[in-house]
């Protein structure tokens, strides 16, 4: 049996006090109990470091850490109302963005030199690639991914498409990033052909791959009603574009789904910082709570489904 609820304070100052251990604890509790609701959190930048001088480190995104621990995929979908018409007039059905999130490493230098990238295998064999020679200050970023993570992303997307009975679109830029994006394209094709093709065909669903720039044009011309799977930064940008065109980020659900079925619900938007600063100045603010409400109803419905609590699931439906 599980407790009625467990609470973990992911506020910036408490994360600082625990050296971010509370984020790890929250992720592990989410895996243990299967369902969680997460409130919006602050990821510090230079401005926040100045605003909160007690911060000992520019802590990483809690969302990113939780996704990494759970190996989850984020699905974002608009909340549709008859009274709010999409800016794109031909959109009739919701467009769900599936976003794969993985970490990168970046650093800066203030002197001339050269940057190389080296992989050292367990066999002792090394592969080294010259990234760039620079004659002055420069910035570098190294992006990486594990095939197991990409494969989990692909499986989550195909399974979510089957569960929600929606077509699946996937887009990268493999003509430019031939090795990196090419791996994503290959793995999605392998998973589809080997595992999901028969189920898709039985349900009358389509899997479709295209380049990211072509996908954007097709999405704008479409009527909606599909899942659009994107890599990390593509998904971050496109989910905001889709949500704004459907209404606003305040009308967007966000669900993190792990391969083992663990599910975390949250509002797609952040802490609405501008409203908070206006509140501190004594101004009146009006913040749309709809995405937060739907985060709770989603979690309550899932809890009801997992525990056979029909009344709880029905309450979530009625509240929505």
Label every model-predicted segment.
Residues 3, 119-210:
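Glycine-rich phosphate/diphosphate-binding loop of Rossmann-like nucleotide-binding domains
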Residues 3, 31-35, 84-85, 90-94, ...:
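Short coil/turn connectors at secondary-structure junctions
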Residues 4-13:
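A short beta-strand-loop structural module common to alpha/beta enzyme folds
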Residues 12-14, 219-318:
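Glycine-rich phosphate/nucleotide-binding loop
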Residues 13-126, 233, 237:
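N-terminal glycine-rich phosphate/adenylate-binding segment common to multiple enzyme folds
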Residues 15-20, 24-28, 196-225:
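A structured beta-alpha segment of the ubiquitous adenosine-cofactor-binding alpha/beta core
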Residues 21, 25, 57, 61, ...:
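Conserved active-site and cofactor/substrate-binding residues in soluble primary-metabolism enzymes
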């Amino acid at each position: 049996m599980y407790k009625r609820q467990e609470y973990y304070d992911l506020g910036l100052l408490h994360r600082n006090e625990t050296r971010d251990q509370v984020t790890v604890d929250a992720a592990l509790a989410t895996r243990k109990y299967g369902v969680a609701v997460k409130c919006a959190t602050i990821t510090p930048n230079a401005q926040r470091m100045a605003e909160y001088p007690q911060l000992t480190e520019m802590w990483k995104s809690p969302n990113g850490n939780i996704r990494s621990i759970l190996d989850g995929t984020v699905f974002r979908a608009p909340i549709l109302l008859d009274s709010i018409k999409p800016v794109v007039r031909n959109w009739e059905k919701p467009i769900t963005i599936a976003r794969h999130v993985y970490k990168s490493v970046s650093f800066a230098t203030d002197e001339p030199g050269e940057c190389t990238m080296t992989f050292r295998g367990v066999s002792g064999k090394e592969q080294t690639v010259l990234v760039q020679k620079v004659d002055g200050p420069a910035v570098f970023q190294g992006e990486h991914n594990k095939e197991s993570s990409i494969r989990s992303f692909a499986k989550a997307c195909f399974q979510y498409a089957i569960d929600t009975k929606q077509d699946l679109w996937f887009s990268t830029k493999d003509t430019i990033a031939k090795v990196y994006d090419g791996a994503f394209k290959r793995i999605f094709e392998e998973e589809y052909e080997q595992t999901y093709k028969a189920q898709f065909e039985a349900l009358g669903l389509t899997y479709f791959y295209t380049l990211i720039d072509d996908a954007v044009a097709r999405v704008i011309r479409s009527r909606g009603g599909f899942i659009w799977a994107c890599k990390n930064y593509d998904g971050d940008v496109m989910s905001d574009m889709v949500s704004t065109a459907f209404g606003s980020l305040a009308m967007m659900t966000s669900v993190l789904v792990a391969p083992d079925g663990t599910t975390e619900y949250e509002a797609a938007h952040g802490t609405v910082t501008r409203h908070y600063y206006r509140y501190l100045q004594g101004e009146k603010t009006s913040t749309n709570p709809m995405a937060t409400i739907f985060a709770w109803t989603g979690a309550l419905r899932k809890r009801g489904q997992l525990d056979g609590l029909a009344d709880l699931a029905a309450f979530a439906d009625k509240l929505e």
